């Protein structure tokens, strides 16, 4: 099983699809990496040699932030927004939508399950 950036790539999938299983690598980035290394995107991960996988690994490490490094950067950016007390940071802190979406109705994904009205006690 091929392993890149700490992720086991799925067997039997095309190489561009398999690379997109890595956090921070989508289809476009996967195609760019494969093109830079000179591997056809339609080849299966199983068909790639250890040397080719090593070239892909080196290309990702050299030119792209993926997995843990990218996750740390994103969380540090959000923490910085919260520390400086800007509007976006306050929205993150309160767990509300950040990009100006409506919250009177909707926004259930960010706000969590509904808090039901407290019923009359008998």
Swiss-Prot record:
InterPro entries: Rbsml_uS13_C (IPR027437), Ribosomal_uS13 (IPR001892), Ribosomal_uS13-like_H2TH (IPR010979), Ribosomal_uS13_bac-type (IPR019980), Ribosomal_uS13_CS (IPR018269). It comes from the Bacteria. SUPFAM superfamilies: S13-like H2TH domain. The lineage of its organism: Bacteria, Pseudomonadati, Thermodesulfobacteriota, Desulfovibrionia, Desulfovibrionales. Signal peptide: none annotated. Residues 95-122 are annotated as: Disordered. Keywords: Ribonucleoprotein, Ribosomal protein, RNA-binding, rRNA-binding, tRNA-binding. This is Small ribosomal subunit protein uS13. It comes from Lawsonia intracellularis (strain PHE/MN1-00). Part of the 30S ribosomal subunit. Forms a loose heterodimer with protein S19. Forms two bridges to the 50S subunit in the 70S ribosome. GO terms for molecular function: rRNA binding; structural constituent of ribosome; tRNA binding. GO terms for cellular component: cytosol; small ribosomal subunit.
């Amino acid at each position: 099983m091929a392993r890149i950036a700490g992720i086991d790539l799925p067997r039997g999938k095309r190489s561009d699809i398999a690379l997109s299983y890595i956090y921070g690598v989508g289809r476009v980035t996967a195609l760019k990496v494969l093109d830079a290394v000179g591997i056809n995107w339609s080849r299966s991960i199983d068909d790639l040699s250890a040397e080719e996988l090593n070239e892909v690994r080196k290309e990702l490490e050299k030119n792209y932030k993926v997995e843990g490094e990218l996750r740390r950067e994103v969380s540090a950016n959000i923490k910085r927004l919260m520390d400086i007390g800007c509007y976006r940071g306050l929205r993150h802190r309160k767990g509300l939508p950040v990009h100006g979406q409506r919250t009177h109705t909707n926004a259930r994904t960010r706000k969590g399950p509904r808090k039901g009205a407290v019923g009359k006690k008998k």
